[in-house]
Amino acid sequence: MIILGIETSHDDSSIAILEDGKVLNMWSISQIDIFKKYGGTIPEIASREHVKNIAILQNFLQEFIDLNKIDHIAYTSEPGLIGCLQVGFLFASALSIALNKPLIKINHLDGHFFSGAIDNKEIKYPALGLIVSGGHSQIIYAKNKFDFQIVGETLDDAIGECYDKVSSRLNLGFPGGPIIDKIHASYKGKYLKLTKPKTSGEFDFSFSGIKTQVLNAFNNKKYESIEQIAASFQEVAINYLIEKFKLAIDKFKPESILLGGGVSANKYLREKFKDLHKNTIFPEIKYATDNGAMIAMCAYLRMKKNS
């Protein structure tokens, strides 16, 4: 079974060809360099860039494979920036009509959940997933491949969004995640005393409080260095994530745990996460950010279930 996966939910244009759970090829174009000067993604510009990028990616695709060999076309339908999603949908629809191939809608977060399973890594169920990105922070309990339940989520800002906002305020650059992660890795000093927020839901998150404490310390000059502020933010944010996820592990007793989403590329988070369970599944770094392979993989597992 050959599946084309299409991902355009935010600022990455990506397509991938997957055969029986294995990636044959993937092509991605990032818009990060475009948005560095703005400190974040501008939806209208992102949509226009997707239109240009999809045309380029289509050429790569046609050079790689006879399109008639594709069995199914999967695309990200939600959540995401509406204009960006529309570009992917129109591209997928045009191919579907031209090739007479069925379309498969895929939820972007489902794709991140299964990103660690790309290239036939086995997920044992029930499973518990931690999905962390610029737009989402969720704990997902999966009884099986498609019986999902969100058991915890952020009540305000997503963790990736906070990384970007903190980094922007400290004039460190965009995107904030890799920059702050690198600073944290080399920092040897004392951390600021920051309070971990409490939430009414046992497994829910609240990152705006952490962000506000960090920005207040910066604005009031209650810090020794910019590195101290950045490292302190990561130290408390990642450990807060891990502590909440530990509670969920104790409650649901999963057979495996998964990490997904753009923030899953964070080295400190991966280091902490791997010690939580005997069966931990990470995406490869190239599959941590938004990509077409995870969309194709999700579709493959769905089709495999139905076959």
From Swiss-Prot:
Keyword Acyltransferase: yes
Binding site for substrate: 131-135, 164, 177, 181, 266
Keywords for the protein's UniProt record, in alphabetical order: Acyltransferase, Cytoplasm, Iron, Metal-binding, Transferase, tRNA processing
Cofactor(s) required, per the database record: Fe(2+)
Localization terms from the record: Cytoplasm
Molecular function per GO: iron ion binding; N(6)-L-threonylcarbamoyladenine synthase activity
Gene3D superfamilies named among the record's database cross-references: 3.30.420.40
Tagged with keyword Endoplasmic reticulum: no
Any GO BP: tRNA threonylcarbamoyladenosine modification
GO CC list: cytoplasm
Cofactor note: Binds 1 Fe(2+) ion per subunit.
SUPFAM superfamilies: Actin-like ATPase domain
Function comment: Required for the formation of a threonylcarbamoyl group on adenosine at position 37 (t(6)A37) in tRNAs that read codons beginning with adenine. Is involved in the transfer of the threonylcarbamoyl moiety of threonylcarbamoyl-AMP (TC-AMP) to the N6 group of A37, together with TsaE and TsaB. TsaD likely plays a direct catalytic role in this reaction.
HAMAP family per record: TsaD
Protein known as: tRNA N6-adenosine threonylcarbamoyltransferase
Gene it is expressed from: tsaD
